[in-house]
Amino acid sequence: MCRIVGAPRTLLPLLAALLQASVEASGGIALCKTGFPEDVYSAVLSQDVHEGQPLLNVKFSNCNGKRKVQYESSEPADFKVDEDGMVYAVRSFPLSSEHAKFLIYAQDKETQEKWQVAVKLSLKPNLPEDSVKESQEIEEIVFPRQLMKHNGHLQRQKRDWVIPPINLPENSRGPFPQELVRIRSDRDKNLSLRYSVTGPGADQPPTGIFIINPISGQLSVTKPLDRELIARFHLRAHAVDINGNQVENPIDIVINVIDMNDNRPEFLHQVWNGTVPEGSKPGTYVMTVTAIDDDDPNTLNGMLRYRILSQAPSTPSPNMFTINNETGDIITVAAGLDREKVQQYMLIIQATDTEGSPTYGLSNTATAVITVTDVNDNPPEFTAMSFYGEVPENRVDVIVANLTVTDKDQPHTPAWNAVYRISGGDPTGRFAIQTDPNSNDGLVTVVKPIDFETNRMFVLTVAAENQVPLAKGIQHPPQSTATVSVTVIDVNENPYFAPNPKIIRQEEGLHAGTMLTTFTAQDPDRYMPQNIRYTKLSDPANWLKIDPVNGQITTIAVLDRESPNVKNNIYNATFLASDNGIPPMSGTGTLQIYLLDINDNAPQVVPQEAETCETPDPNSINITALDYDIDPNAGPFAFDLPLSPVTIKRNWTITRLNGDFAQLNLKIKFLEAGIYEVPIIITDSGNPPKSNISILRVKVCQCDSNGDCTDVDRIVGAGLGTGAIIAILLCIIILLILVLMFVVWMKRRDKERQAKQLLIDPEDDVRDNILKYDEEGGGEEDQDYDLSQLQQPDTVEPDAIKPVGIRRLDERPIHAEPQYPVRSAAPHPGDIGDFINEGLKAADNDPTAPPYDSLLVFDYEGSGSTAGSLSSLNSSSSGGEQDYDYLNDWGPRFKKLADMYGGGDD
């Protein structure tokens, strides 16, 4: 069993801490200063220091919490400091004066700013033996005694009390390590024991807070505790012999961290927002503010109280609100909230712990912003009692007046938005009032046309309201009602026909000049004397005319119900009525003539072509009648054959099947194949009836056993129409013109070709030495030409000295050529035929000449030409002496030129 001796001494640190907290609370809170809060840290140790033994904790004040600090020791061989500020022994050594004092450095990792603090270690004083014994008896926890039972097993001695927890105040100032209690076993008299503790705070995170001397069993705390981090530590103490064998069962040690008032209350929000309607009664709930305190809520340190420090503005009362000091509920305590006077209140709220003690409590403040919301306590009022406007007649969607109002309520809220209504002066609903969402003005608009001739002025009574009803007890003043006077302006209106359309019934076939009706228009402008004139706007068949003054409509052609311009027996014509107002206006009217049918169309046979066999059997021809008239001037029809020619009734017979159909058959046993025109008399049922002889073209053909014609030809019309004949003639004429133009063009091209040939071949042309070089075709002949053998004379050499070699195909042969007599004169230019014949004769008489009229290749001629330079040519009139004998070497093409310049006097 364990026991605790000297409880009063154990409570001394707690009482000292409470006294210290009271002094701090009374003195206020000092400003935070970064660095070590102490100038010197002290620790009292025993003679021997073991490796890894925690010695003390140096606390660094990090105000903003953002600094990353690393610690160093001035004696790194003996002491080290972890990141939490706990100082450990690096090695085991006996504590002496040389280790009594050293420095601890703290350096900011980012800014490299550095702080230092001194650490002083002192030896535990050597107390007399009696004093040690007394001290050990006072602060000991003894392991429970164990009795040996008869069976050899240990049995714990029963006790009627348990080990009470150790109460340790947070934020103790030390010195550290601070001794708490001594743990010992009754068996230490006979055995050499070693003590240890386990659990969170010892060998489990956070490690190193509690340490125990393994020899003496002295349990100590190495640093200040923080209840807000860990409120209770649960440790287990162990006792083993030097061999590590357990000699006592572990005992539980509970250390409670006593709360100190070291945390100020903190509001959840620094600014709180709330609303309250204007005109609220006292006691109206507004909002709730809340603060929290990290201290123990079951003690005075965590019990908060609220109060209002100030109110701004202080009108109409400096105490418009109050706060529940325990819950933080803010309520109204005075009447007179008016948004139009004060729209917002700002309250400074204070929360204080220790139940609001002004002496020992810590406090904090926040701001409560209370907005006074609007209610509809101000009706809209017109800025004037009367408004005026004007509008042209027959205009709609026109704003005629702008109504302005004032409202003291909050803009653009239902209590401010105006709604206008017309309470009188508009029984037919011709006006409406819309609200401008931006300006809140009322826009009086015309929604139905107004006729000046009916109403010249309107006096409207209008009222203005809000979208929500007025607050209770508030009435609409007279300023919420006004009058609007609207003047209607007369404008020139369109004349109008009445009725429109106008329908009349007339029989077709009326002769031209018949007066049908009078179609006049009315002018709605009764107060504007004006004249109206009429014109025809649409008359598809051009049957009608209208008198421009009186509007009488007369026919100018025969009305025909069967006209394509008549739809469903109705003919539509449109007329225009125009006045002489400023500006002139016009209106249109439609006259619908319902044409009654008369029997003016004779029936016709349908179909107009048919075919039948040479014998009466096996088929017949079914026919019917087409009549453009309608009942009763159409069917039933009567079908008959004429008496003349007599062959009709002799060859054919017709049988009436019903009122619309009849059957045509051969009367004789055989009729030769061919095309026959059979006249048929068809009579309708009109009054009087109308008859017509209609021709049916019948093709009589040979038939097979099924009664089908074996001929493939069909009935073709006996003749062509005039239009077809004209078209065919035009096509023939166009083709003839095209052929004639082609022939003329061919003849002209032949003449041009002959003229070009004359410029090259004739003997009397002085330009025969000009050749055409635009064709440069060629093959292997010009590629194999030996260019080294080309003659390049600067002057024409005699034939005798010309070297023999490869010659050009167009060069005159070396051997002698026949000489032709020189003609005295060139033929007459007009005698083209003789000129050509003479040229042909001269060419044919030269048996040695190659075919010089063939296509030659002139793609390459060496560095010079046998013709020499043309710039050396001079006429005989120049008087220069020239040698033209070389012209004789150019062949028969240039014989005429050689005769002219080198052949004698001519």
Swiss-Prot record:
Residues 1-25 form the signal peptide. The chain crosses the membrane at residues 725-745. Ca(2+) 1 binds at E170, D226, E228, D262. Keywords: Calcium, Cell adhesion, Cell junction, Cell membrane, Cleavage on pair of basic residues, Glycoprotein, Membrane, Metal-binding, Phosphoprotein, Repeat, Signal, Transmembrane, Transmembrane helix. GO terms for biological process: adherens junction organization; calcium-dependent cell-cell adhesion via plasma membrane cell adhesion molecules; cell migration; cell morphogenesis; cell-cell adhesion; cell-cell adhesion mediated by cadherin; cell-cell junction assembly; glial cell differentiation. The modification Phosphoserine is found at S96, S135. Residues 746-906 are cytoplasmic. Ca(2+) 3 binds at N261, N263, D293, N301, D353. CDD domains: Cadherin_repeat. Residues 26-159 form a propeptide. Cleaved by MMP24. Ectodomain cleavage leads to the generation of a soluble 90 kDa N-terminal soluble fragment and a 45 kDa membrane-bound C-terminal fragment 1 (CTF1), which is further cleaved by gamma-secretase into a 35 kDa. Cleavage in neural stem cells by MMP24 affects CDH2-mediated anchorage of neural stem cells to ependymocytes in the adult subependymal zone, leading to modulate neural stem cell quiescence. May be phosphorylated by OBSCN. GO terms for molecular function: beta-catenin binding; cadherin binding; calcium ion binding. Residues 863-884 are annotated as: Disordered. InterPro entries: Cadherin, Cadherin-like_dom, Cadherin-like_sf, Cadherin_CS, Cadherin_pro_dom, Cadherin_Y-type_LIR, Catenin-bd_sf. Ca(2+) 2 binds at E170, E228, D259, M260, D262, D295. It is found in: Cell membrane; Cell membrane, Sarcolemma; Cell junction; Cell surface. It is a single-pass type I membrane protein. GO terms for cellular component: adherens junction; apical part of cell; catenin complex; cell surface; cell-cell junction; cytoplasm; desmosome; intercalated disc. Glycans are attached at N190, N273, N325, N402, N572, N622, N651, N692. It comes from the Eukaryota. Residues 160-724 are extracellular. Residues 863-880 have a biased composition (Low complexity). Calcium-dependent cell adhesion protein; preferentially mediates homotypic cell-cell adhesion by dimerization with a CDH2 chain from another cell. Cadherins may thus contribute to the sorting of heterogeneous cell types. Acts as a regulator of neural stem cells quiescence by mediating anchorage of neural stem cells to ependymocytes in the adult subependymal zone: upon cleavage by MMP24, CDH2-mediated anchorage is affected, leading to modulate neural stem cell quiescence. Homodimer (via extracellular region). Can also form heterodimers with other cadherins (via extracellular region). Dimerization occurs in trans, i.e. with a cadherin chain from another cell. Interacts with CDCP1. Interacts with PCDH8; this complex may also include TAOK2. The interaction with PCDH8 may lead to internalization through TAOK2/p38 MAPK pathway. Identified in a complex containing FGFR4, NCAM1, CDH2, PLCG1, FRS2, SRC, SHC1, GAP43 and CTTN. May interact with OBSCN (via protein kinase domain 2). Interacts with FBXO45. Three calcium ions are usually bound at the interface of each cadherin domain and rigidify the connections, imparting a strong curvature to the full-length ectodomain. Calcium-binding sites are occupied sequentially in the order of site 3, then site 2 and site 1. This is Cadherin-2. It comes from Rhinolophus ferrumequinum. The lineage of its organism: Eukaryota, Metazoa, Chordata, Craniata, Vertebrata.
